[in-house]
């Protein structure tokens, strides 16, 4: 299994999961040109993409979905409510490429066993994903205003966790956003803070989670260094030695790297 965050942040999101010969884009929230450039960087031919799986209908996750599906004849997977919400936003998609799933029920795309799960965000029916194959498991969990025991159970034991660390609460409160937007971000239907991500990871460490990529950082209310330092310190303060975990931050405007599992 291989995972590459191509772009991650409040301005656009797209990652690729490769299991065996199966290549799956998770969201396509950048322009087609930008996604093509990133795929070239990680050595994936867009003609060999097997699917796009969509987390929710916000523009920073679907901007390139329609373009890519039409140009490369790629199936697009989303639940019914997300399809209904995003259809007017992405243009026509061929009927044979419209695929739906039910949250909580696994499905297969080639070599990948995928389970979509509910998250808490102000979208029609947002999901995260668990990808299994090749003896490994990746959990993709962004755009969630809170984490609960159900999400902890889903993430437990993951070989790699792609986890939102959207904002520093103090930066957000002091920043230029209007109050209603600040309130939305801080709500249970908003985004996960650095501190909340750290607290969540402390509970996951005993389950075997050791590799974590922090994701979906806000441009205005966070920095890579602040997110990394806050989460790292939470783990260290909990008595977890640094040598026992791998922690990094997904980049906003360039490929973060290639992670083999």
Predicted ranges, named:
Residues 63-72, 87-89, 222-229:
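Metal-dependent catalytic neighborhoods of phosphoester/phosphodiester hydrolases
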Residues 1-42, 127-143, 160:
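Conserved beta-strand hairpin/beta-sheet module of binuclear metal-dependent hydrolase folds
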Residues 80-128, 132-135:
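Metallo-beta-lactamase
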Residues 4-14, 55-65, 87, 116:
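Structured catalytic core of nucleotide-sugar glycosyltransferases
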Residues 59-62, 84-85, 124, 147-149, ...:
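Active-site environment of divalent metal-dependent phosphoester hydrolases
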Residues 149-248:
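Cap/insert and terminal regions of metallo-dependent hydrolase folds
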Residues 33-78:
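Active-site metal-binding motif and surrounding structural segment of the metallo-beta-lactamase
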């Amino acid at each position: 299994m291989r995972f590459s965050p191509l772009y991650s942040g409040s301005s656009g999101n797209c990652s690729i999961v490769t299991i065996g010969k199966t290549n799956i884009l998770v969201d396509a929230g950048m322009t087609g040109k930008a996604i093509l450039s990133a795929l070239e960087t990680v050595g994936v031919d867009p003609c060999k993409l097997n699917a796009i799986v969509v987390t929710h209908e916000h523009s920073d996750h679907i901007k390139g979905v329609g373009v890519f599906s039409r140009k490369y004849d790629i199936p697009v997977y989303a639940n019914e409510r997300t399809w209904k919400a995003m259809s007017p936003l992405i243009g026509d998609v061929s009927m044979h490429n419209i695929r739906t799933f039910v949250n909580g029920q696994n499905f297969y795309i080639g070599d990948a066993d995928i389970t979509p799960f509910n998250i808490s965000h102000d979208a029609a029916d947002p999901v995260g994903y668990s990808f299994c194959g090749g003896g490994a498991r990746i959990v993709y969990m962004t755009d969630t205003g809170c984490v609960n025991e159900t999400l902890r159970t889903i993430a437990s034991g993951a070989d790699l966790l792609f986890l939102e660390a959207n904002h520093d609460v103090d930066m957000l409160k002091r920043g230029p956003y209007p109050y209603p937007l600040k309130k939305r971000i801080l709500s249970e239907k908003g985004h996960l803070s650095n501190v909340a991500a750290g607290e969540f990871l402390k509970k996951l460490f005993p389950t075997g989670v050791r590799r974590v990529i922090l994701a979906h950082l806000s441009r205005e209310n966070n920095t890579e260094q602040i997110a990394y330092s806050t989460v790292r310190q939470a783990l260290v303060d909990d008595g977890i030695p640094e040598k026992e975990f791998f922690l990094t931050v997904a980049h906003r405007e360039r490929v973060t790297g290639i992670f083999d599992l």
